[in-house]
């Protein structure tokens, strides 16, 4: 993986039969560690997701397929490159050379664009939450299926570019090299790979996270304005679709996880593509030992990306690590610690939701619900944020026999209202969309 393509039209100023053995040993060591860490990490994630008792979500689906894409990278990019470095030359038939080169680029496309689709899903969940109610699982499967199909098609040209050929006429030494009829062919190929696998995805990711950050900032601003107005006139702010209370802690955690995955991708792959572009666009570039070391180091850094992702999943999703440890009876103590942390987190989350619900009610019965943000988007409402023409209340087993019901602004003609689990003397109830 030191070079995306070995062009047969390159100059042969250096000895084509030799190599720097010290650099080769370093490559073999790093690639071996990378392969085993990537396989163990991604298998752990897949095993944890298979054994989890939690309901599968869209995010779990994307994580699962991103792990599968990283497994493709490990077995069909890192492993062949490791064998290649051990043998120095490619020892195999021509069709195997073409297949290996195809699968190497297939893994790169699949892993990259699966990450892009996962980011797009987070963008929809944060910036357009109502769209997540419209067959979200079906949309996720379409996004994942299209990613695999496009990756397969975009990597197909490898079959026509690479073949088993002599590294020098009359040398009788063969290797799996790329053939370019025109001198500019190698430049076009490297530029296409760089744009398709790195530049376009990075631009899409930056745009998505720009909108996500703007949406979160806007909602924080709305929450601050609502809190200030509530303090002044005692009114209760309306809970809008774009409210901070709707952007749950779980969604924000998945956004953070996706952002870390994106940053790890950029850090690992940026040096590799920079060096590759430098090698084909700089006419003074030569493949001597010093520059070969730079190419090698950048390629090794790129290969580390496939073994970073599973540990990022484990870090941001505690239950995956717990579900993985459930497979090993000897890990009972750390498993219990993770279970306790997850339980404490659930208690804190439920307590926070109870306080938020109680904070929306006025003590004297009916409260006014208003939205401090004047934007049309923030005025859209679901569930709690509405005034109904009529509502029905169900009595709750509280200290008082009657329960007070807050009328809500619904788009429907009627809604059913159920009381909260009250600890106060009077019970208050919130609407439930019928």
UniProtKB/Swiss-Prot annotation:
The chain crosses the membrane at residues 28-48, 68-88, 99-119, 142-162, 192-212, 258-278, 296-316. It is found in: Cell membrane. It is a multi-pass membrane protein. Its main location: membrane. Glycans are attached at residues 6, 12. GO terms for molecular function: peptide binding; vasopressin receptor activity. InterPro entries: GPCR_Rhodpsn, GPCR_Rhodpsn_7TM, V1R_C, Vasoprsn_rcpt, Vprs_V1A_rcpt. Residues 49-67, 120-141, 213-257, 317-434 are cytoplasmic. GO terms for cellular component: plasma membrane. Expressed in pituitary, liver, gills, swim bladder and lateral line. Keywords: Cell membrane, Disulfide bond, G-protein coupled receptor, Glycoprotein, Membrane, Receptor, Transducer, Transmembrane, Transmembrane helix. GO terms for biological process: cellular response to hormone stimulus; positive regulation of vasoconstriction; regulation of systemic arterial blood pressure by vasopressin. Disulfide bonds join 97-176. The keyword Cell membrane applies. Residues 1-27, 89-98, 163-191, 279-295 are extracellular. The keyword Ribonucleoprotein does not apply. Binds to vasotocin. Produces an induction of membrane chloride currents indicating that it is coupled to the inositol phosphate/calcium pathway. Belongs to the G-protein coupled receptor 1 family. Vasopressin/oxytocin receptor subfamily. This is [Arg8]-vasotocin receptor. It comes from Catostomus commersonii (White sucker).
């Amino acid at each position: 993986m030191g070079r995306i393509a070995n062009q047969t039209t390159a100059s042969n100023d250096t000895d084509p039969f030799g190599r720097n053995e010290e650099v080769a040993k370093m490559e073999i060591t790093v690639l071996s560690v990378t392969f085993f860490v990537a396989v163990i990490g991604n298998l752990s994630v897949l095993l944890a997701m298979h054994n989890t008792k939690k309901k599968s979500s869209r995010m779990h689906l994307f994580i699962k397929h991103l792990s599968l894409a990283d497994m493709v990278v490990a077995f069909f990019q890192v492993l062949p490159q490791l064998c290649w470095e051990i043998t120095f030359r490619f020892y195999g038939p021509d069709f195997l050379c073409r297949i290996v080169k195809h699968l190497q680029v297939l893994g790169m496309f699949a892993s990259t664009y699966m990450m892009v689709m996962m980011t797009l899903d987070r963008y929809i969940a944060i910036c357009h939450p109502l769209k997540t109610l419209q067959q979200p699982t079906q949309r996720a499967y379409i996004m994942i299926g299209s990613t695999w199909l496009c990756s397969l098609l975009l990597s197909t040209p490898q079959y026509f570019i690479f073949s088993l050929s002599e590294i020098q006429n009359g040398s009788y030494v063969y290797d799996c090299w790329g053939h370019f009829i025109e001198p500019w062919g190698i430049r076009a190929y490297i530029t296409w790979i760089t744009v398709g696998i790195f530049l376009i995805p990075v631009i899409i990711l930056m745009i998505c996270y720009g909108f996500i950050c703007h949406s979160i900032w806007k909602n924080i601003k709305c929450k601050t304005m609502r809190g200030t107005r509530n303090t002044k006139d005692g009114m209760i702010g309306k809970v809008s679709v774009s409210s901070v209370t709707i952007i749950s802690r779980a969604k924000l955690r998945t956004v953070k996880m996706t952002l870390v995955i994106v940053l790890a991708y950029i850090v690992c792959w940026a040096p590799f593509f920079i060096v590759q572009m430098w090698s084909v666009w700089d006419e003074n570039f030569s493949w001597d030992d010093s520059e070969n070391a730079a190419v090698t180091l950048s390629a090794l850094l790129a290969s580390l990306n496939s073994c970073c992702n599973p540990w990022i999943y484990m870090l941001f999703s505690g239950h995956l690590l717990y579900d993985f440890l459930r497979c090993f009876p000897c890990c009972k103590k750390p498993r219990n610690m993770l279970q306790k942390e997850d339980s404490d987190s659930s208690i804190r989350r439920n307590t926070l939701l109870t306080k938020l619900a109680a904070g929306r009610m006025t003590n004297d019965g009916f409260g006014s619900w208003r939205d401090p943000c004047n934007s049309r988007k923030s005025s859209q409402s679901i569930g709690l944020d509405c005034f109904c023409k009529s509502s029905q209340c169900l009595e709750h087993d509280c200290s008082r026999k009657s329960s007070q019901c807050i009328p809500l602004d619904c788009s429907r003609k009627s809604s059913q209202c159920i009381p909260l689990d009250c600890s106060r003397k009077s019970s208050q109830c919130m609407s439930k969309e019928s």
